Every structure is written in structure tokens, then in C-alpha cells.
């Protein structure tokens, strides 16, 4: 399985993602934002960080990078694209995913572990995974997912919500919502379920000595389903 991680000016989780992908068997290549062509890829990842210093809006400038034309074409052709944190913001800004990501409810940067509940398993990212609740790390200032009434109806009708913020027992409620996201949304798919955006960082949870192993379960399941 071949993967590509896009590095933008200000990305700071690209190397973590590279380590995670290689650990679970991907042949990964790092791709610079100014490149025009994607290498052979079964999966393209837009990593976390602060692309272009988060100027204008988070992910706005990165969404106009040269490489994004190839990413858009790859996704529109059915290729698997995953955006984590700032990568999620870039996917929203590029129009590959619906909605927007606003400032956190209490206007504070949030950096902590959270529990998330997988909602839809009819896709390559969570299919066949027996685990429903993951403990992942979040670190963001603009992770408050929002969209219009028409959009949220369509998202629910199409089963596009990938992850909910929850407690450790899978209860989705206001108490388990760290940033004010609409309906506790932590991640969404496009209609075709080949593009995933998520605020939590699975790549930070692949070593039990440092953090936890729930990210390992996510990546192992992902490569199994892409084979």
C-alpha cells in the first residue's frame, strides 16, 4: 500500500503521520505543497499543524496550494483522502467536505485526550473494526464544527458523520463535547465515504509507552481494508 503525506508551510504533524503510516505497512512518501503531481498513492493524508500560520482562515491558504489540484482530482476519482486537524480544515476549505470549523466554544486552545465514537462503518476507514470507542488526542483552536440546517440534514440523511465526541462509555452528550461542535461531530465523510476529515490525532496514539494504542487499531484496520 502506497501513501502520501502532504507537507505545507507550518505543518507540524507530517513526520508523526509518516512514522505512523510506515509502522503499519504503508510505503509512504512526503509530498511538498508546491509539487504538482501526486506519486502513486492508495491514500493521501493532509496532516495537522498550522499551515501558513493559520492566516485568513485555518486551511484557507493551504487549500489553494499547487498540490491540491491533484488531491482534488484524486479524491473526485474515488481515491482515499484523510485530513487530520488542520488537514480537516483544509479539506473543508477546498470543498471536499461540507461545513466549516470555527473557534472553539470557549475561545481557548484545547490540548487533551478525548473519547470519540465511530458512527459509520460502511467505509474503508472503520469497516470491520470491532472497536467503537477510541481514545485519541486533540490539539486545536478551531475545531468547532458547524454547518447550515440544510447541510446537517443532508449529512445525517447520508450517514456522513464519521466520529462523535463521547465519554468512555460511548455516551454522546454536551459534557463530552470539548469545543462546541454541532451534534458533537468530531469527523465527517464526503457523500462517497472516500474522504474523511477528523479533528482527533490517531497518529499520536500508536505507542503504549508514550500515549496509547487506539491509533494502532485505527491504522492497522485502515491498511487491512485498503489491501
Curated annotation (Swiss-Prot):
Superkingdom of the organism of origin: Bacteria
InterPro entries: Class_I_gatase-like (IPR029062), PRibForGlyAmidine_synth_PurQ (IPR010075)
Recorded name of the encoding gene: purQ
Name the UniProt record assigns to this protein: Phosphoribosylformylglycinamidine synthase subunit PurQ
Keyword Nucleotide-binding: yes
Alphabetic keyword roster: ATP-binding, Cytoplasm, Glutamine amidotransferase, Hydrolase, Ligase, Nucleotide-binding, Purine biosynthesis
Annotated localization: Cytoplasm
Residue span(s) of domain Glutamine amidotransferase type-1: 3-227
NCBIfam families: FGAM_synth_I (TIGR01737), PRK03619.1 (NF002957)
Organism whose genome encodes this protein: Pelagibacter ubique (strain HTCC1062)
GO molecular function, one term: ATP binding
Record SMART domains: GATase_5
Keyword Secreted carried by entry: no
Amino acid at each position: 500500500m502506497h501513501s502520501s503525506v502532504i507537507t505545507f508551510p507550518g505543518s507540524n504533524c507530517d513526520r508523526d503521520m509518516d512514522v505512523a503510516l510506515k509502522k503499519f505497512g504503508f510505503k509512504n512518501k512526503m509530498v511538498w505543497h508546491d509539487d504538482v503531481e501526486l506519486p502513486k498513492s492508495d491514500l493521501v493524508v493532509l496532516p495537522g499543524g498550522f499551515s501558513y500560520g493559520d492566516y485568513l482562515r485555518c486551511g484557507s491558504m493551504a487549500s489553494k496550494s499547487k498540490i491540491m489540484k491533484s488531491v482534488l482530482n484524486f479524491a473526485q476519482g474515488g481515491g482515499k483522502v484523510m485530513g487530520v486537524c488542520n488537514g480537516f480544515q483544509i479539506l473543508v476549505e477546498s470543498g471536499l467536505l461540507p461545513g466549516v470549523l470555527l473557534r472553539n466554544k470557549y475561545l481557548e486552545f484545547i490540548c487533551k485526550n478525548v473519547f470519540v465514537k465511530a458512527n459509520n462503518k460502511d467505509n474503508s476507514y472503520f469497516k470491520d473494526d470491532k472497536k467503537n470507542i477510541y481514545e485519541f488526542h486533540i490539539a486545536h483552536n478551531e475545531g468547532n464544527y458547524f454547518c447550515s440546517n440544510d447541510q446537517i440534514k443532508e449529512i445525517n440523511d447520508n450517514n456522513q458523520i464519521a466520529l462523535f465526541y463521547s465519554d468512555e462509555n460511548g455516551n454522546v452528550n454536551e459534557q463530552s463535547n470539548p469545543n462546541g461542535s454541532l451534534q458533537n461531530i468530531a469527523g465527517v465523510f464526503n457523500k462517497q465515504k472516500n474522504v474523511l476529515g477528523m479533528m482527533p490525532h490517531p497518529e499520536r496514539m500508536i505507542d503504549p509507552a508514550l500515549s496509547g494504542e487506539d491509533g494502532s487499531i485505527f491504522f492497522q484496520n485502515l491498511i487491512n481494508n485498503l489491501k
